[in-house]
């Protein structure tokens, strides 16, 4: 054995059920479940059935867990599948007489049926599918901040503590286990966060490689685009760092992450893979391949499933050989077995990169048969006792490695409001109780979601991001007024609770224990 490999999949979507349908809203979740979560469960279960030995880490954010477990999601997702199937049947009529397109439509219709059957076989409970794999030893589930708040920019430690502790509580409520690992939203780190993680029983978290402090530290300016932080010598990512007693930092390996993440330089940009951006006007089905990244959408060639599958296997072999080469080199130089940790947004696999789940299955299968490398979780590697010491800078995995993606000229007004509301929440925290206090907590957490400034900055759904932020802030302030005896007759707590139906079992009293 020359080393270990750990793949970490960060799985998150903001609270979107009942908050619009298309193009912005709950269809985000339905699409990602169809494209990614269920295909991922499918390939992992296939590996188990084939007798492969493997381990991966799946992070499920608490806000996503709550949505996947809701009756609303289960009902609406089945409706989504029915609608998708009906649109596919219309494609069959449209493409009648064109066997190339008809064959692909039939393939997609079978895929819909397979996904429906898998969902039903899980009793419409995707979370239980991951829990089952964890209990069998193939998956390690980790948690995150309750609503994926961007922790470094929060004003008060109490806000960070509430996000972290709520996340751990919700994870325990749904999985029955205490999480060992914690995904800092956007890998956003600020010195001192580790104290909060340790207080909540966390054993490890993950940062981008450039977070490691080397030499003189540079003071960053908030709100400006800055040159990308320098990535250290890659060998410094091959062992974890003990940041506090029994709390470890694992660094994302830069080159293996880029090899998979990048559409321009990585595997997903290969011309034979399915083109994400071109969709048929009737169904939204994707019938074309990338062909070449410089080819206009109107000139894309027809997608070939078999060709793409073969290329995914080729890329899996290349990736495993890359892992072995890097781990062997580190072993020769250091005399110890290292670990390569590669972390990605889960939706890359299937949603953005259609062939991603197949590639992942092939990678884990190849590693299972290889004597020089083993797939493990960070928890497994910690038990080896091999570690380093290190310091880490305020950072993220966002643009430039700092905070610009969430804090800039377009979003600074959001943070002014957030900081005001943090102070309000802090002033009330020790007096809050019962339904009203727990409802205030919920709206506070939803206001803190990092997704709202992200959507504004990236222009993916700028107006939607602003509206959602202001919606939850308005509800937070209304509940504050209710608690203070102001306008009590105009604040409908039941309506707020119905509209924002997650976190029903999260009690404000639990956070003070």
Question: Model-found features: residue ranges?
Answer:
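Short, solvent-exposed turn/loop segments enriched in Gly/Ser/Thr/Pro and often Arg
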Residues: 59-64, 145, 181-190, 210, ...
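CE4/NodB-like, metal-dependent polysaccharide N-deacetylase domain
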Residues: 160-184, 322-343
């Amino acid at each position: 054995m020359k080393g270990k490999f750990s793949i970490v999949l960060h799985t998150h979507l903001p609270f979107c059920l009942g908050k619009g349908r298309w193009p912005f809203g709950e269809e985000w979740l339905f699409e990602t479940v169809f494209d990614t979560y269920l295909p991922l469960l499918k390939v992992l279960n296939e590996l188990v059935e084939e007798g492969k030995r493997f381990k991966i880490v799946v992070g499920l954010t608490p806000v996503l867990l709550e949505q996947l477990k809701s009756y609303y999601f289960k009902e609406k997702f089945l409706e989504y599948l029915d609608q998708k199937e009906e649109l596919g049947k219309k494609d069959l009529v449209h493409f009648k007489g064109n066997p190339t397109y008809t064959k692909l439509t039939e393939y997609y219709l079978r895929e819909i049926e397979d996904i429906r059957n898998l969902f039903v076989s899980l009793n419409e409970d995707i979370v239980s599918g991951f829990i089952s794999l964890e209990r069998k030893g193939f998956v390690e589930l980790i948690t995150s901040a309750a609503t994926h708040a961007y922790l470094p920019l929060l004003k008060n430690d109490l806000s960070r503590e509430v996000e972290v502790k709520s996340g751990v509580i919700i994870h325990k409520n749904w999985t029955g286990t205490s999480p060992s690992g914690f995904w800092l939203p956007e890998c956003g780190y600020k010195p001192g966060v580790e104290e909060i993680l340790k207080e909540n029983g966390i054993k490890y978290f993950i940062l981008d490689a450039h977070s490691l402090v080397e030499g003189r530290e540079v003071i960053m300016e908030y709100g400006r685009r800055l040159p990308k932080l320098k990535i250290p010598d890659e060998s410094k990512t091959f062992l974890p760092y003990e940041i506090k007693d029994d709390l470890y930092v694992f660094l994302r390996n830069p080159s293996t992450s880029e090899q998979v993440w990048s559409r321009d330089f990585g595997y997903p940009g290969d011309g034979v893979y399915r083109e994400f951006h071109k969709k048929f006007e009737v169904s939204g089905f994707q019938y074309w391949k990338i062909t070449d990244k410089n080819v206009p959408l109107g000139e894309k060639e027809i997608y070939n499933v078999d060709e793409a599958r073969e290329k995914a296997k080729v890329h899996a072999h290349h990736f495993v050989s890359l892992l072995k080469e890097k781990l062997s080199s580190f072993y020769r130089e250091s005399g110890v077995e290292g670990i390569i940790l590669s972390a990605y947004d889960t939706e890359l696999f299937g949603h953005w990169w259609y062939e991603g789940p197949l590639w992942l299955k092939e990678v884990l299968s190849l590693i299972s048969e290889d004597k020089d490398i083993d797939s493990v979780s960070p928890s497994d590697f910690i038990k080896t006792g091999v570690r380093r010491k290190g310091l880490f800078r305020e950072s993220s995995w966002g643009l430039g490695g700092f905070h610009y993606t969430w804090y800039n000229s377009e979003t600074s007004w959001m943070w002014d409001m957030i900081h005001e509301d943090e102070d309000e929440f802090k002033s009330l925290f020790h007096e809050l109780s019962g339904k009203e206090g727990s409802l205030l907590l919920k709206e506070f957490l939803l206001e803190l979601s990092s997704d709202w400034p992200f959507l504004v900055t990236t222009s993916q759904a700028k107006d939607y991001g602003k509206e959602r932020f202001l919606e939850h802030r308005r509800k937070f302030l209304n509940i504050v007024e209710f608690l203070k005896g102001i306008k009590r007759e105009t604040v409908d707590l039941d309506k707020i609770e119905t509209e924002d139906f997650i976190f029903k079992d999260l009690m404000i009293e639990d956070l003070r224990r």
